């Protein structure tokens, strides 16, 4: 379980991106964060993985407060958290299987990683994951030759190579066409349901969120304005989530 308690983040210049954000997300469920641009969605995901530090609050995962960990322990817990990025974050000059194998680098020695010394078992696992995301025929194709949807699926397979317990997805379908969007969201839903993973996704598309999410969190101006089952998010709730300056002060 992921438990966020009273998380607050203020950037230089006094811009407060998150204000007393609290929620829980469960394994085996897709939790989707929605809200207007600048609501704090990306800041929240980056905080959970401690890519940025917060002013106050707790982020509890795997029975630990991520915010309070030293560098060594933080590196260990990050190995349990996969990241899917809007811009794919692949090495395009490498093949699909090479990119996927890089997902397991945290388990290898520095020398083995630098020299790309992968075992037969690791290569077989990478092929299995590539097949799982529907790209077996593209395993040895350079990622520069893949479509956006295919690249995002490579990113998912690479994340799975990490053996994560939680996957954080920052706008994973923002650049995809409708067909690729469905394929990627189906894969993420399957990870939650069949692998029992905790999947946390930032989205702009409300219709996709309501179709695929078990749990929706609505952010506006750094505040949570909705937190509940997806099927209970009414049109009034959605309107409030996307209302301009819901927490503006004079």
Predicted segments with their positions:
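Helix-to-loop junction immediately C-terminal to a conserved catalytic motif
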Residues: 49
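Conserved ABC ATPase "signature" region
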Residues: 65, 112-137
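Conserved ABC ATPase signature
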Residues: 142-146, 150
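Catalytic Walker B motif of ABC-type/P-loop ATPase nucleotide-binding domains
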Residues: 167-170
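Helix N-cap at the start of a conserved alpha-helix in ABC-type nucleotide-binding domains
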Residues: 178-180
